[in-house]
C-alpha cells in the first residue's frame, strides 16, 4: 500500500487516495430496508420424504449426558405438556370469557401441576434449558422449509381410508396416526412430544399435616440443599416474560370424578371398559386419539388406577406491560407484520436486536383455600430463573430481561440487582411486604386491554392470611377498569398424596427466592449448542411420530366440564361441589350474549387497529432504545423529533437521510483531523470523549445542526467521533458477528486467523465494510506510517484502545469483550493490505447485491469451498442448498463426494489431546463440511440410496457420521412408505375402452345426464373420471424428486436415474392417445359424438381441478388430424360442446401459448392450489430456460452461479406446487384401471380414423397443369444474397471454404506469421475475417483481431461444431447484415453457386453427364479480372510490328510526361471514389466415366460485381476458363461440348488436349481448323492456322492476374 507522508498528510490527499482505491463513499444505489425484529426463516424449500425414525444410538450420538437426559425426560415432558396446552388454548379462552366463573375451580389443580413440574426440574433446569434451546435452535436452523407440514397433510389425506381399521385398532389398544398429525402453531409441539402430567395434589389436608409432610419430603429428596422452616411460608412474585396481552389458558389433567356432559363433537374410545376422552382439535373437547398401527406406540398409561380424563380449562391472571410511549401495547399480531419484509435487510435489522427486547411481565396470583367455603386469598410466587422453561414462549421469540421490581413506573428496566443466593431467605413478613410492593408496581402498569383473573397455586404452601389479603387487594384495586377479575374455588375429592405431589411441594419450598434474584440470561448460555446435533432428516422423522394438537377452528366451542354462563347462584353451588342442572337460556338471553360477544370482538379489533397505528407512529421517528423506555419526557420527545439528531441513530438511517452519502460527522471530522498537524495519538484520542467541550457539543447536536469543520481543537473532534461510534444502536461491526470474533481471537495459527477474519469482514454490508476500510486507511496513513512523534506500536495501541471497543461491541461490557475489540482492531491495522487490498481471487467473481458481496462466477473448487464456508452464509443464506441441489449441471455426484472427502481431510485436526489442539487450533472448516454433507444427504438421499457405490463412498469418507447418515442411505422402510396408499392387486392387462364397456350398454354419464340411453344406468360421470385422472397424475407429480427436476431443466431424463419423471413425461402422450383411441375405437357415429361430449366434460372438470396435464392432453387429442378429419362426426357434435371446446382453449392459453419473456413465472402465478402441470409443456419451457442461460463462462473455466440460482428458484416453485393442499377425493376401481392404461400407436390410430370415415373421392374436372416458368439463375442468386445472415449457410460453408479464399484488394496485408499458420481451419477462418475487415475499416479489423478468440478459441477442435459461436461473433462483433464483411460472406457459400450448376446441367450442357472434380476457389478483388481478353491481349502484343516500337521510341518526352500525369490523376480519383468489389467462384467439373474415350474436364467461374457498399449485385458473368479433352475423346462428346460452351468460352485458346499414355505426358494432337494453336518463345512467335506441333496449356487466371 502506498502511504502518504504523515507530515504532509491532508484531507484532499486522503480522499483522493480513497477514490483511487475504489472505496465506496456513496450508497444511494444500495437497498437499505428499515430494520425489523428478527423473524424466523420463511419456508423456502422442503426436503424430500423423511427417513425412518432414528435408532437409540443415533439419538444419543455425540452426547456425553445422554443418560442424564433420559433420566430427566419425564420432568421435561411434563413442563412441555403444560406449555403446549397453554399455547393451544389462547383463542378458546378469549371466546369463552363468560365461562370463567365455572372454570376457575380448576386453577388450583393446574397451578399445582405446574409447581410440581417446576420443583421436579429444579436441580437440572439449567441443563434442560440449554438442551431445549439447543434443540429449538437446531430446528430453526435446519428446518428452513417446515417440510413436516407436507407429511402431516399426507397422513390427513388417508384419514377416511383407515376408518374400516378403527375397530381393529381399538381392540389392539393403539392410536391412529391420522388423528395425531394435525396442524399446530406451537413450535414446542414440534420439538418434544407431550406426555401425561402427574396428578395434582388433593385439597382438604390439614395445614399442620401439610407442613410436616413438606418438611419430611424436603429432607428425603434433597438432603444436600439447605433450607429453613420459613421456606414453606415464603412467597414471592412470579415474574415471567410474554409477548401477548390476551388472557392465557392452561390445560392440565385431573383425577376428579365430576360428571360432565360431553358436547356433540366429542369422541370416545374404549380402553378396558373405561372411557378415554382426549383433547380434540380445539384443545378442549375429547377426540379420537388413536395411532396408526404402522408405527409402534405404547398404550396410554393409567394414572393412579384412573384413566386420564378430559383436560380442564384454567384461566390465569396475565398482566402485561409493554415498553412504549403513551402506554401503547404492541401485540403479537402487529409485531409479526415485520416478517413480510425482505430477508436482505437481516443484517441491518440486527441493530435493534438488543434494544427491542420488550419487557413484559406476567403476574400469576395463586392461592389455595383451606376449605371450599373460605375466602380465596392471592399469593404471588417467585420461582428462580433456573426453573423457568426456556421454551415457554419459543414461538413468540421472547427474552427474559432484568426487571427492577422496586421501580414505581414499572417500565424502566435499566437497573439491575445482583442475584441473591437461595440460602439467604427473607422472613415471612419481609417477603410479604416485598410481594405487595411488587404486585402493586406491576398492577400499576397494567394495560387497558389486559384481563386479570385470580388463580391458585400449590395447596401445600403455608399462607400468611394478613399479608396475602394485602397483596390480593392491591392487585384487585390497581387493575384497570376494562379488566375482568374472577375467583373461584377448586372442586376435587381428597386423595392421598402421591410422590409427584411430594416432589412438587419440596420444589416450591426450596425454589422460593426474592424478586431481586431474577437476572437476564446471557447470550452465551442461550446460544450454546447441544453436542447431540441432529440433522433435519432425523428431526423430521421424529416430528412425524409425535403428537400434534390441532388449533381451535371454532372460537365458540365449550371446553370439557364447562357449561354456558349461569347466574351467581349456580356458580356458588358448583363451587361447593353440589351438582346443579343446567339452566336453559331463553332466545332473548342467547341473542343478548351473542350481541355482547360481537360488540366485544369489534371493540378488540378496533383497539388492535389503533395499537398498530400508534406503533407505526412511534417507530417512524424513534429508535428501539426510546421505545423501550416506556416513558418519554417532553424534553426527550423534543430530541426524538429533532431533524438534526445524529447521535444514537442508525448508520443506515443517517446515510439515507444524506442521499446515500456518508453523514457529515464522519466526513467533516476526518477532514479536520487530516488537516491537523497534531500527530501525538495519545493527546488526540485517548480519553477525548470525556472532555466537557465534547459533552456540550454532543448535547447541542440533538437540537441544532453542528458544523464540525469549524471546530479547531482536534481532540474535541476526535472525542465527538469516538462518541458517535459509541452511541450507535448497532456497532460498526455487527454485534451478531461478535461471537465469531471471539472464536477468531482464540485461534493461534496466524494464517488461519487472518483468512477467517477476511471472510468475516467480507460478510459485512457494503456500507460497513467501506466505512471500516476508510477509517483504517485514515488511521494508518495519518498516525501510524511515518509518524515522527509516536512510534508505530504505541500509535496502534492507542487507536485500538480508543476505537476498538466502539467498533466491536458484544452483548455485555465485560473486560474480556473490550479486550477482544482492541485486539481485533490491532490485527486489522497490522494486516490492512491483506484484509482489504488483496481481494482479487482468480477463480471467483463477485457482484454487489443490496450491499452484500454475492458470487456471480466461480470455479468448481471455489464453489465447494464457499458451500462449506463458515461465514459466506451471512451474505447468501441458501447458497449451500442451491449448490447441492443444482450440482448436476457441472459435476457428477461421485466427483463431488471425492472433493468433499479431500477437503475434509485437509481441514481435519488430527491432534488428539486438548492441550495440543488448543495450541495449534485451526478453523472450524471440518465441522461445516460435516454439516454440508448432512444437508446434501437430507435433500438427495433418495438418489443416493439407488446408487450404492456413492452411499458407501460417503459413509467411508465420513465414518464419524455413519450413525446419522446410515438410516438415510440404507434401504430400510421409511415413513413415506407407510403414508403411501397401498396398491391393490389386480389382474387387468389392458385398459377398457369406453366403447367396449360402456357405450354398448348405454352406461356413459355426464354432469348433465346420461347419453345414448344411459340416463338411468349412469355408471361413470365426467366428474368421477376427472377426479380419478387427477389422482393418477397427482401421484406421479408428487413422487418426482428434486434432482429429477434439475435433470429436466438440463434436458437429460434417463428412465433409470429418474423413473418417476420419465413416467410423468409419458403420461401426457398416454392421455392424448387414450382419448383418440376411445373416439376411434367405435364405428358408430352417435357413439363417437357421445364420447366426444364426455371427453370435453372430463377436460373441463380436470381444468377446474387444476389438472392441466389431462385437460391439455384431451384438448390435444381433439385437435389432432386423425380426429379433426372426421367431418361427419363433427357435424353431429352439438353446438354447446363446440362452445365448451372454445372456452376450454381460452382458459388454457397460459399453457398453450406461454409468455415469451417469463413463461414459467406466469404459470406459477396463475396457480394457487394443488395442481398437476402439463409435463410436456413444462419440459419445453424449462429446456428453453436452460438454453438461454449458459452454464459456464465464456472461457469455460468458471460456473455461472446466476444460472444455479435461477434453477434453484424453479425447483422451489415446482416443489411449492407439489406441497399444495392434497386432493380429498377417494380412489376407486377406476383409479387402478387408469394407472395401467394401454394406448394405441399413432399408425393404428391413423388406420382407425380411415376406417371410421373412409376418404370420399370426388370426381373433379381435369385441369392441365400450367406451364411452370423456370426462374432465371441470376434472380435466384439475388434472392439468396438478400436473405438474413441467420437463414444462410455461411456458418456451415465458411469453415470448409476458408482455405480457398484469395484476396487481391488494395490495402490487403498478410504477415509471414499468418501465412505460416495456413492449413489450420480456425486460423484460416480468422485470416479470412481479418482480410474482409480490412476492406471495410481499420476499427473493424482491430475488433476482429481482439475479440475472435473470446468466441472461438484457437485451441478449438477443428472438427467440432462451432456454427453458433461463429454466427454469434458475426452478429455481435461484425454487426451482422449491416456490415460489408457479412454481405461479402453471403456471396461466398454453396447457395450462390447452386443455381449456376443447375443452369449448366439442365440448359447449357444438356445431355452430357458430368460430375464435380473438386477444387473450389474464391477470388475477392476490387479490380475487374475478366479473362475475356487475357490471351488475346498477349497475342496482340506478340504480333506487334517493330515499327510500333520505334514510334514509341521516337515519341517526345513531353507526351510521356502528360500520359503519366493523366494516369496518376485517374488512380487518385479511383482511390478517392468507392471502388466496386468483384467476387469470383472457380469450380471444376469432369466426365463421369474414367475411360479416355469419354474423358473431358472443364473449369467455369461465376463473377459477381458488387457496388461500393456491397448492398446490391450490379452484374453477373458466367464463363468457361478451361476445357480439356483427351486425344481419344469421342467426336460426339467433344463437338457437343464445344457447341454448348461456344458462347461461354473465355477464348478459343483455352481448349486443350491431353494424351493419356503410360507417362501421361501431353503430346501433339490434331485439331479442327477453327482452333488456334499458340506457341510462345523468346525469340519469335509463329501463328499457324492449319497445323499445330505443340499444345500449350492455358495460363491460369490467377497467374495472369
Swiss-Prot record:
Start and end residues of each Rho-GAP domain: 649-836
SMART domains in the record: RasGEF, RhoGAP
Main location: cytoplasm
Localization per Swiss-Prot or TrEMBL: Cytoplasm, Cell cortex; Cytoplasm, Cytoskeleton; Cell projection, Filopodium; Cell projection, Lamellipodium
Location of region: N-terminal F-actin-binding domain: 1262-1601
Domain free text: The N-terminus (residues 1262 to 1601) functions to regulate both GflB-GEF activity and its localization at the leading edge of cells by binding F-actin directly.
The name this protein goes by in its record: Ras guanine nucleotide exchange factor glfB
Organism: Dictyostelium discoideum (Social amoeba)
